[in-house]
């Protein structure tokens, strides 16, 4: 790993993390939840009903007319004419909007929660590998450490029960941007802005964590480089990106 060029190492880490995340998901849950036409596991697979709420929100949103904010579902919350925003059903607005755009070519029965959970495991592994790659240089320790994140008990406890809250990759990518930004004295503004906007459309629960990393990096950057405008742009831009996503959704 030490002999690899920086860009090569990044791709190796991403591939390693993706494969371990994929292996963890398939090992734990198999392939049944990945079938978009199979929603039996949603209705009967768990004793926790949150996933029912998420799925019902998606079904109502899919059968609603387009309006603004984008995540508003007028097929829900009768008799309210404007319906309700699917943020309140934790139906991952960004993902729901994406699949609603594709709805005309999708089958009548379509659940994407299994596919999103698979993506969570893959992204969790990728983010973990990047974080560990800042400190470890041998393949075996990197793989072992990444596997611990891929099989994280906290992740497993949330997976397929409260799908939005298993998006731990958001926090890990924010941690990576903070650690690398601190090491290289860079702000990584687009990364934090993107994470904030993404997070609001997945679950705002992780937004304070992303904002804290942005604030820490902004303060350290201001102290060490004296580039106050960039530091302000990092933190306040992160907050603004989250707010803008909230307005749109």
PLM ranges: what are they?
Residues 1-39, 231-240:
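Start-transfer (signal-anchor) and selected internal transmembrane alpha helices
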Residues 4, 69, 73-76, 219-223:
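Short helical patches
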Residues 23-124, 152-156, 162-167:
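Membrane-interface coil-to-helix junctions
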Residues 92-96, 138, 185-189:
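Coil-to-alpha-helix initiation sites in intrinsically disordered, low-complexity, charged segments
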Residues 102-106, 135-136, 202:
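A broad structural signal for alpha-helix termini and local helix breaks/kinks
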Residues 108, 222-229:
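Transmembrane helix-loop junctions in multipass membrane proteins, especially transporters and channels
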Residues 118, 122-134, 141-182, 188-222, ...:
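Membrane-embedded helix bundles of polyisoprenyl
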């Amino acid at each position: 790993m030490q002999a690899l060029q920086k860009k090569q190492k990044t791709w190796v880490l991403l591939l390693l993390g993706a494969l371990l995340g994929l292996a963890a998901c398939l090992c734990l849950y198999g392939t049944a939840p990945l079938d978009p036409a199979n929603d039996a596991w949603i209705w009967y697979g768990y004793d926790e009903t949150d996933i029912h709420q998420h799925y019902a929100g998606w079904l109502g949103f899919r059968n609603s007319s387009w309006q603004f904010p984008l995540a508003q579902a007028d097929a829900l919350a009768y008799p309210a004419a404007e319906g309700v925003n699917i943020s309140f059903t934790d139906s991952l607005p960004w993902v729901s909007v994406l699949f609603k755009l594709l709805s005309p070519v999708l089958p009548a029965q379509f659940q994407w929660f299994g596919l999103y959970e698979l993506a969570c495991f893959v992204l969790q592994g990728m983010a973990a590998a990047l974080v560990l790659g800042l400190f470890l240089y041998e393949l075996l320790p990197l793989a072992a450490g990444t596997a611990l994140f891929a099989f994280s008990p906290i992740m497993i406890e949330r997976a397929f029960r409260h799908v939005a809250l298993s998006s731990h990759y958001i926090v890990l990518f924010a941690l990576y941007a903070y650690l690398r930004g601190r090491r290289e004295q860079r702000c990584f503004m687009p990364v934090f802005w993107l994470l904030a906007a993404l997070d609001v459309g997945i679950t705002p629960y992780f937004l304070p964590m992303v904002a804290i990393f942005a604030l820490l990096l902004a303060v350290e950057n201001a102290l060490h480089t004296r580039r106050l405008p960039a530091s302000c742009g990092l933190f306040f831009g992160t907050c603004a990106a989250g707010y803008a996503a909230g307005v749109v959704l």
